[in-house]
Amino acid sequence: MKRLSDTSSAITHTNKSGIASFRNDQARLSLAFTDDAGTTRMTERSHFGPLRVQKTLYPEHPAVCHAIIVHPPGGIVGGDQLTITARVGDRAHALLTTPGAGKWYRANGQLSQQQVSLEVGADAALEWLPQETIFFNEADVRLEHNVTLAADARYIGGEILCFGRTASGETFDSGRVAQRTSIRRGGKLLWFEQGALQARSTSMHSPLSLAGYTVCATLIAVGKTMNGAFLNELREESSALAQGGRSGATQMKQVLVARYLGHSSETARLWMTRAWQRIRPELMQRDAVIPRIWNT
């Protein structure tokens, strides 16, 4: 059995009181998961700065390792750079999530960035299911998400993007969010999406982007071509949960994309959870066991 390696490093500085503290402008986290006779174990966990794994859990089966990624400062400000890398070895299965919403604050003239790189081996599975992301006024954000899958690997990736907090009366009146996502399987590019949204621009209201809504949830599943009956049921159930927003699902060969547009992060969370509960058993042959952290 390969043992867990856990390394960490950090940059500190001394404030006027002589107390050392983190400079959290850069943070990196690297994880690896390995199959050990039917049990998925985290065999690498290295971090630089305030990105960490809180704990690993097995709420459903030893074959599926749930890991909670934590960014202790609680929010990202201008100049911060987060890099997350995860590798899931052959036959292993990992689910990665976060303990709460990710918050991107005012840029102060500096770009904030997050780069996620995920690699999944043969007959392995990965679920990337962070909780919602909130962009506050004057945020300047660039997000990059790259997934590399073996020819028979399976993947579910979800995200909820909130532009402002409408429930608190906080709108996204200034700022910019750029995003790029790519998914490859067996060396072939299956999915590529990129775009940039500028607050108050026409792109925020385009039917090709947010269509005037402030919350966007996307769930992508790779690894199986769903039949027509399943897709119709998914569309009907998802639309019923949209509550005044919009919902849809599209199958492109072995890539299923489901999306919600609305004004409620709470509705988006419910929509995402239900869509995942519907898709996961079909793709992963496992019932959807909700991560415990989602209920806290």
UniProtKB/Swiss-Prot annotation:
UniProt GO molecular function: nickel cation binding
Keywords, in A-Z order: Chaperone, Cytoplasm, Nickel insertion
Coiled coil: none
Highest taxon of the lineage: Bacteria
Annotated Gene Ontology cellular component terms: cytoplasm
Pfam hit, one: UreD
Compartment(s): Cytoplasm
Membership in a protein family: Belongs to the UreD family.
Oligomeric and partner information: UreD, UreF and UreG form a complex that acts as a GTP-hydrolysis-dependent molecular chaperone, activating the urease apoprotein by helping to assemble the nickel containing metallocenter of UreC. The UreE protein probably delivers the nickel.
Function: Required for maturation of urease via the functional incorporation of the urease nickel metallocenter.
Record's protein name: Urease accessory protein UreD
Organism: Janthinobacterium sp. (strain Marseille) (Minibacterium massiliensis)
Name of the gene: ureD
